Amino acid sequence: RRRILMYYKPEGEICSAHDPEGRPTVFERLPPLNHDRWVMVGRLDINSTGLLLFTNDGELAHRLMHPSNEIEREYAVRVMGEVTPEIMLNLKRGVMLEDGMAQFDDIVEKGGEGINKWYQVKLKEGRNREVRRLFESQGLKVSRLLRIRYGSVSLPRELRTGRYLELDRREIDTLAGLVNIRPRQGTGLYGIEIGRAHV
């Protein structure tokens, strides 16, 4: 059966199955799978926190990450420096980064004290350090970055850092539906799948 976990990544864990330097990885706290493996959907850098999805369905993971499917990601970002109306406009219109144009689909100020203010941003791709690089292109520094949503899945308030929750069937079907993967068929009397979706 298709399974999806949502994991609340803490700071300091790397998004890799093994680290030559011996740093903790996001895979270490996941439940073991028999005759299967967890595939990570997208990544977060070592200093970022928040929602990471894992699935045992490699095709689903691939489609959720592929830029052509434009799956929206949402982040809460704490920024050091003044984000002027002009900068907000630049970030929504698009900025040339070293790997091409990038932009936020939405950016909303969420308050804060002094030079540290929180913003909520949305974008439909997940290039390496893209959120940080967009702000850095405007001379601003990101001091905290938390992913709060990936597609139809939001980070639940009750989920603590370093913990995971398994999505229920309805949540899985909703997320899979965003990338045109049909629900898997029901199971027979002995829990054996009696048909797979053709994708």
Model region roles, listed by residue range:
Residues 1-196:
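Basic, flexible Lys/Arg- and Gly-enriched helix-loop patches that mediate nucleic-acid binding at interfaces
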